[in-house]
Amino acid sequence: MAGDQMHVLSALDSAKTQWYHFTAIVIAGMGFFTDAYDLFCISLVTKLIGRVYYTADGASKPGSLPPNVSAAVNGVAFVGTLTGQLFFGWLGDRVGRKSVYGMTLLLMIICSVASGLSFGDTPTSVMATLCFFRFWLGFGIGGDYPLSATIMSEYANKRTRGAFIAAVFAMQGFGILAGGAVAIGITAIFRSRFPAPPFAADPAASTPPQADYVWRLILMFGALPAALTFYWRMRMPETARYTAIVAKNAERAAADMSKVLQVKITAEQAEMASPVDKPFTSKPFGLFSGEFARRHGFHLLGTTSTWLLLDIAYYSQNLFQKDIFSAIGWIPEAKTMSALDELYHIARAQTLIALCGTVPGYWFTVALIDVVGRFKIQAAGFFVMTAFMLALAVPYDHWTAAGNQIGFVVLYALTFFFANFGPNATTFIVPAEIYPARLRATCHGISAASGKVGAIVGSFGFLYLAQSPVPAKAAAHGYPPGIGVRNSLFALAGCSLLGFLLTFLVPEPKGKSLEEMSRENEVGQP
């Protein structure tokens, strides 16, 4: 792309920050709000679902989901997300970002409501219905990853691009807090309206019939914020970079951007800016071409592997916070509480950890990513996560002893803080900045799907890996013997350390245009 062809894209890169940028953050971020809300809430309500559907008459302890059912409920949404990331990433490059953007949000709205309406004559059929709708919910959420990241990167100016993409991702923080607030609020209402004794006092009465409505209402509420932004998402124009570079309609690109951004672009300037009307010395290369491998092969290896390793560590802990809290004594023993009391205590504990550790990390990234840079934040985040996991694992017996649990929780919260002020944010941001426009959503989708493979490994593997190595103790929970929580933390520390090393494959996009990073601005390059 010759220098005089860069006029329009340079105008977008240098455009001042304005109100539409913030509007786009909210519109694009609703998918991540729903993603985090669903992930947070499903880890809460699985305990309640176990009590409602799997408590046997005469049992000495409250019911819980069988291992295979728990793995399916927790993991099926990840399988859907992975599939959606690959499909909608490819489709976003094929037919345009805007063309499919509304489809993902509509899927989230419908399937969030449908998850709460899961039906069946037996517990197995209810769980099968829930898993079906959670797969398609994940499919819609997955599509939002490459589309939202790509749209925000192509709207933003290069000076604050990292902060804008990070802010979209940081909507997960609001989703987490909303999940906690909704769960606490609904549970508090039902507890006061339908008081129940602890399981130890009266097993049957400890789970009132109305508890079956609680988990359904919590899951369904996730559809509301997405529904409120659907209209505005459908009104968003296609990005200028896609329209001019990929769709070859420079005049439309100029008109669209002039409507929403305070950038004056004439049709003549847009035509000059479109690289499609100029001869190139080489043909456009595809994803599986040798030219792509030469230019971006190591980049793709870096973005996929670091996201994979981050999500193994992140989701292994995030999905099962409630079990860790119970193990260290932060949540009372299940049989000393009613079903709604247990949900209330778990929701309160997880919300406190999110408020103190998880959510602030997102906004530290927003504030500092365009100052410090992506590479430094990601490398430092992986390194500090490794250190904190080792600090949890080495003296694990000390942390689980009576009186020391608060120290464990503080280190645990700091681990999440540096995950979010670190690789959890940067692995999402960088793939939207370093690949060519015609492959940008596809490559982001591939990177994100790799991350979800890690989440699947974490969500399925941690159920078994963290079980006690003593067969009798593991069997009491319905699992085969594992390696224990302590050794699992050592394994997760190893994943974080490897992520730190592989970060060196990822380039630094701070302060550079998208065309500079993808090398689309080079003379003779497509």
UniProtKB/Swiss-Prot annotation:
Keywords: Membrane, Phosphate transport, Symport, Transmembrane, Transmembrane helix, Transport
Induction of expression: In roots by phosphate starvation.
SUPFAM superfamilies reported in the protein's UniProt record: MFS general substrate transporter (SSF103473)
Keyword Plastid attached: no
Membrane protein topology class: Multi-pass membrane protein
GO MF annotation list: phosphate transmembrane transporter activity; symporter activity
Cytoplasmic face of the membrane: 1-24, 92-99, 144-163, 233-296, 373-374, 431-445, 510-526
Lineage top rank: taxon: Eukaryota
GO-annotated biological processes: phosphate ion transport
Extracellular side: 46-70, 121-122, 185-211, 316-351, 396-407, 467-488
Transmembrane segments: 25-45, 71-91, 100-120, 123-143, 164-184, 212-232, 297-315, 352-372, 375-395, 408-430, 446-466, 489-509
PROSITE patterns cross-referenced by the UniProt entry: MFS (PS50850)
One Gene Ontology cellular component annotation held by this UniProt entry: membrane
Record's subcellular location: Membrane
Family membership noted in the UniProt record: Belongs to the major facilitator superfamily. Phosphate:H(+) symporter (TC 2.A.1.9) family.
Function: High-affinity transporter for external inorganic phosphate.
Other comments on record: Although related to the sugar transporter family, it does not transport sugars.
NCBIfam families the record matches: 2A0109 (TIGR00887)
Stated name of the protein: Probable inorganic phosphate transporter 1-7
